[in-house]
């Protein structure tokens, strides 16, 4: 008998089949660089910067930009942003630069040029006979990179928000050390013609390169990052949420994971902490791995670690955090079970304040306080004969140990208590819920629960 087959009848005919499903052809790829080669892209022939500036600025004013020309110009303009490396810079074994070296964004990556000439049409003609200043180049580079940030703003009813962001970014590139080179609202008008540019690999690569450079190097034009900052930890919402969670509850990653009482966390935790990655290394290629093309399918996204993501944001909802209430539920990752665990953890880390004296008039007052606290602890640890001292953690209402929390969940049959439900309903009902958000899920799931 084949253990993988099932047997049944169809119109009195015996049928034996082996059920199979479509395999996931898009495997998660980790960004670790193993060949010691810098991330690279291939672009057309390097342009004359004056010609390129004139052409790109004309295209921006006409709301008609060629992405290949824009990428070629952005890569060529990197030479204008020379800075000094503050420390030895090494990532995944690649020596990017040494302390004191003069570097540009191009130092971080390998840009291969072909003989293909760009269009450089200069449509609309700009009356520019002199060479553009570095400030003018910096303003144009900054405005072009803002198109990346604007194209990452997606969702319903984002029109006004996007316009306001565009206006604020435009204002940055009108004031020193930058200089005004376009009329007001040009950026938003241009964006409408380039709404999906964040999906263009070369444009995304260059945005990430500029961001990685300006995040490390103290530079006059560092404000260019306003358009590229969204490339940092892109497609890492699962890992970023977990990092924020442990900071919020004031635990180490190891301590926090002990509270994750569900078998589906195992694969996700293993995926999130794969050895050999530079998740905790400052200024690593890891931070910009998505934009630099080092991973096609991120193992750190909300979908890749959906149970972890759901749990963290249910705890956040319990704590009344707007970001968690607005986040999108990963429907395929046990949201009902995660909401139960989130309620208990929310109660443990939010429902009870941790208050204690930390500041004193002098050393004697501090010493007296510590001695008094030590006496209290000794008295609390004494066995009163009613509960085995070895089991106190399981029954003490004040403890936050994983064992105690797990026991309380089991003693309540793996269901939320009335207090948990009332808290969930309270925070979600007073919030304008977005479609498929945690606020909407909690409202629909628990608003009619009478517990």
Swiss-Prot record:
- Role noted for this protein: Encapsidates the genome, protecting it from nucleases. If expressed without protein P it binds non-specifically RNA and therefore can bind it's own mRNA. Interaction with protein P abolishes any non-specific RNA binding, and prevents phosphorylation. The soluble N-P complex encapsidates specifically the genomic RNA, with protein N protecting the genome like a pearl necklace. The encapsidated genomic RNA is termed the nucleocapsid (NC) and serves as template for viral transcription and replication. Protein N binds protein P in the NC through a different interaction, and can be phosphorylated.
Checking Pfam families in the record gives: Rhabdo_ncap
The family note in this entry says:
Belongs to the lyssavirus nucleocapsid protein family.
Organism of this sequence: Duvenhage virus (DUVV)
* Keywords in alphabetical order: Capsid protein, Helical capsid protein, Host cytoplasm, Phosphoprotein, Ribonucleoprotein, RNA-binding, Superantigen, Viral nucleoprotein, Virion
Protein's gene: N
Name the chain's protein.
Answer: Nucleoprotein
Output the PTM entry: Phosphorylated by host.
Question: In the UniProt record, which is one GO cellular component term?
Answer: ribonucleoprotein complex
Subunit structure of this chain's protein? Homomultimerizes to form the nucleocapsid. Binds to viral genomic RNA.
């Amino acid at each position: 008998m084949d253990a993988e087959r099932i047997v049944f009848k169809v119109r009195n005919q015996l049928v034996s089949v082996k059920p199979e499903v479509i395999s996931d052809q898009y495997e998660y790829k980790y960004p670790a660089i193993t060949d010691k080669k810098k991330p690279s892209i291939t672009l057309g022939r390097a342009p004359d910067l004056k010609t390129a500036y004139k052409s790109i600025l004309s295209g921006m004013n006409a709301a008609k930009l060629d992405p290949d020309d824009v990428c070629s110009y952005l890569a060529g303009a990197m030479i204008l942003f020379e800075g000094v490396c503050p420390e030895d810079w090494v990532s995944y074994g690649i020596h990017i630069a040494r302390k004191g070296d003069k570097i540009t964004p191009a130092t971080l990556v390998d840009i291969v040029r072909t003989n293909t000439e760009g269009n450089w049409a200069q449509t609309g003609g700009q009356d520019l006979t002199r060479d553009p200043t570095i400030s003018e180049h910096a303003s144009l580079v900054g405005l072009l990179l803002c198109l990346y940030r604007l194209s990452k703003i997606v969702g319903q009813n984002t029109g006004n928000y996007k316009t306001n962001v565009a206006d604020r970014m435009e204002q940055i590139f009108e004031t020193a050390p930058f200089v005004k080179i376009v009329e007001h609202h040009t950026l938003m008008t241009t964006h409408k013609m380039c709404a999906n540019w964040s999906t263009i690999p070369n444009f995304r690569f260059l945005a990430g390169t500029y961001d990685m450079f300006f995040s490390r190097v103290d530079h006059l034009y560092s404000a260019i990052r306003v358009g590229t900052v969204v490339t940092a930890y892109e497609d890492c919402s699962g890992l970023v949420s977990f990092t924020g969670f442990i900071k919020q509850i004031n635990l180490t990653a190891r301590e926090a994971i002990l509270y994750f009482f569900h078998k589906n966390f195992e694969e996700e935790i293993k995926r999130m902490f794969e050895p050999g990655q530079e998740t905790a290394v400052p200024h690593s290629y890891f931070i910009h791995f998505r934009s630099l093309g080092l991973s096609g399918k991120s193992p750190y996204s909300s979908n890749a670690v959906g149970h972890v993501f759901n749990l963290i944001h249910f705890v956040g909802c319990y704590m009344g955090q707007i970001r968690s209430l607005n986040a999108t539920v990963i429907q395929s990752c046990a949201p009902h079970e995660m909401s139960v665990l989130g309620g208990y953890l929310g109660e443990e880390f939010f429902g009870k304040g941790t208050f204690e004296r930390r500041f004193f008039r002098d050393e004697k007052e501090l010493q007296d306080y510590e001695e008094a606290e030590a006496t209290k602890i000794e008295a609390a640890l004494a066995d009163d004969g009613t509960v085995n001292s070895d089991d106190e953690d399981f029954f003490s209402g004040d403890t936050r140990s994983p064992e105690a929390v797990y026991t309380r969940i089991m003693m309540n049959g793996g269901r939320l208590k009335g207090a948990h439900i009332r808290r969930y309903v309270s925070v979600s009902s007073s919030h304008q819920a977005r479609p498929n958000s945690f606020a909407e899920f909690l409202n629909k799931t628990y608003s009619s629960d009478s517990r």
